[in-house]
Regions:
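Catalytic acidic motif of RecA-like/P-loop NTPases
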Residues: 44, 125-126, 224-231, 274
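Conserved helicase motor
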Residues: 94-105, 123-129
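Conserved pre-motif I regulatory segment
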Residues: 2-40, 226
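Coupling/switch/interface segments within P-loop NTPase motor domains and analogous charged loops
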Residues: 116, 120, 126-215, 219
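Conserved P-loop NTPase motor "coupling/switch" region that bridges the ATPase
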Residues: 85, 89-92, 96-98, 142-182, ...
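Conserved SF1/SF2 helicase motif Ia
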Residues: 38, 42-45, 50-81, 87-91, ...
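Conserved motor-coupling elements within RecA-like helicase/translocase cores
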Residues: 102-120
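Loop/turn-to-beta-strand initiation segments
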Residues: 65-66, 116-119, 214-216, 263-268
Length: 325
């Protein structure tokens, strides 16, 4: 399907700025899609203005009430500047370095929860320290663990002990990370005690989880940095790894939360390099953005996806250091 954004008028946009057709079409897709959206435009194509316009329109049209834009740490100020360049009258909240940790972070998250912002721009590293509730984390982890246990059973049934061991090791690592982050969440709850009540007048809850922020739209800039999501599979080839980066598991939890609350179509990833090392990265992008579509097509499991859309080919390659094959 092709999306035509020529109908969009962008009320409130700065006079003298006209978005290109590809930017308008991307915004139209984000606003109309029933799944998450990957904006895989090349470097220099204007993904920042695309993201700003999409979030602002989603807020204006009522598709979202609390859009959040997650960007690399050094780009928060630039994103805020670009947002106000495109929408001079916008009411945005942008995270500074002082807001990134400790009491500064507690105050910032409380402002996010209490304010009516057109958009909130946050630093990547601070975003990944704000988790969904421990109860939800444990529930989501149980789902992923079940997928891995199924793959372990498959591997052991065909005598693939190597793949089975890798999957078991990854489950152990994920359980360790889960236990650590749950304990950290409990400590955070004590540390930010009172911040949310002061701004919300809510005397019942003494901590802030991601769910408390009211976020119902996520725009992830430089999304290729979240490609290392654990893959439950017995396929053992370069580029397909069962290991996961914790920040990727955390983002997946937040995407699952948005889907669970009916906002899965408000997940937007932007990157100029959607594939850098392996085609398996495309599978992970689809898991973040459109897992229901994968299930509907019968390719939710990586093995099914790989057999449907790819093939394993043996070839000779030069070593990265260039000294052999």
């Amino acid at each position: 399907r092709e999306y035509d954004g020529s109908y969009l008028t962008f009320p409130g946009i700065s006079t003298g700025i006209d978005l290109y057709d590809h930017q308008r079409n991307a915004v139209a897709r984000i606003l109309q899609s029933k799944e998450g959206t990957l904006v895989a435009h090349v470097v220099g194509a204007g993904k920042t203005f695309t993201g700003v316009a999409a979030c602002h329109e989603a807020k204006r049209l009522g598709r979202a009430t609390h859009p959040m834009i997650v960007v690399p740490n050094h780009l928060t100020e630039q994103w805020a500047k670009d947002y106000l360049t495109l929408y001079p009258d916008a009411n945005i909240l942008s995270m500074t370095e002082a807001d990134g940790a400790g009491k500064g972070a507690a105050r910032f998250w409380a402002k996010v929860a209490a304010g009516d912002w057109d958009a909130v721009i946050v630093r990547q590293d601070t975003f990944q320290r704000m988790h969904v509730s421990p109860e939800r984390r444990e529930r989501y982890f149980s789902r992923r663990k079940a997928e891995m246990l199924d793959s372990i059973d498959t591997a052991e049934a065909v005598g693939n002990d190597f793949s089975a061991k890798k999957l078991k090791d990854e489950i152990g690592k994920m359980e360790k990370n889960l236990n650590r982050t749950v304990k950290q969440a409990e400590r955070d709850r004590m540390r930010v005690d009172g911040k949310l009540q002061a701004l919300r007048g809510d005397g019942n809850k003494e901590w802030i989880d991601f769910e408390d922020l009211g976020v119902d739209m996520l725009f992830i800039d430089e999304a290729h940095q979240y490609k290392n999501l654990a893959i439950a599979t017995t396929i053992s080839v370069p580029g397909v790894d069962v290991a996961a980066a914790q920040k990727c598991e955390d983002l997946f939890d937040k995407c699952e939360y948005l889907r669970e609350t009916g906002h899965g179509s408000n997940i937007v990833f932007a990157t100029g390099t959607p594939v850098s090392n392996s085609m398996a990265e495309l599978y992970n992008m689809q898991r973040y953005l459109a897992p229901d579509l994968l299930r509907a097509q019968g390719v939710a499991a990586f093995t099914s996806w790989a057999n449907t859309y790819g093939s394993i080919v043996e070839s000779v390659e030069v070593k990265p250091e260039g000294s052999g094959y």
